[in-house]
């Protein structure tokens, strides 16, 4: 069964870029959510291998770290790995302190190092 990545808070073009990057390197399905509520709902409904959360959510510019904290605080799904998508190291450090795996920025989308970060979660 293919791995599943849930991408939260990205606009359509960025979501499609992430989906294309993932599908070109892994046999994984990429699903889109837009905020904490629909992400938590999806995490409760199916097995998810990784969640990526945009630093600033596309629809309302909510801080993605708030989504991360809600996921990590949930006793039913808090063990699902989460990455914050940001180009800024200080935000990566805040995310790691909140329980995230090291994420990546959109500027590094095509880098081999990004695939190396994703491989432990999306490789079969």
Stretch-by-stretch model annotation:
Residues 2-22, 51:
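Conserved acidic segment of CheY-like receiver
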Residues 27-35:
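Short hydrophobic/Thr-rich beta-strand motif most characteristic of the beta2 strand and flanking loop
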Residues 34-50, 56-58:
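Acidic, metal-coordinating helix/loop segments flanking the phosphotransfer/catalytic sites
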Residues 44-46, 72-78, 98:
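Conserved phosphotransfer cores of two-component systems
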Residues 52-71:
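Conserved phosphotransfer microenvironments
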Residues 63, 87-108:
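Alpha4 helix (beta4-alpha4-beta5 surface) of REC/receiver domains from two-component response regulators
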Residues 78-89:
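A short, hydrophobic beta-strand element within the central beta-sheet of small alpha/beta folds
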Residues 113-124:
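Receiver (REC) domain switch/output surface
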């Amino acid at each position: 069964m293919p791995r599943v990545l849930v991408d939260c808070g990205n606009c359509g073009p960025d979501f499609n870029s992430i989906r294309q990057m993932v599908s070109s390197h892994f046999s994984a399905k990429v699903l889109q959510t837009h905020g904490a509520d629909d992400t938590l709902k999806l995490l409760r409904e199916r097995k998810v291998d990784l969640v990526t959360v945009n630093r600033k959510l596309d629809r309302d510019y909510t801080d993605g770290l708030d989504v991360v904290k809600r996921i990590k605080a949930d006793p039913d799904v808090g063990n699902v790995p989460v990455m914050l998508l940001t180009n800024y190291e200080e935000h990566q450090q805040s995310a790691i302190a909140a329980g995230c795996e090291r994420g990546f920025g959109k500027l590094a989308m095509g880098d081999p190092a990004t695939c190396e970060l994703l491989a432990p979660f999306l490789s079969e």
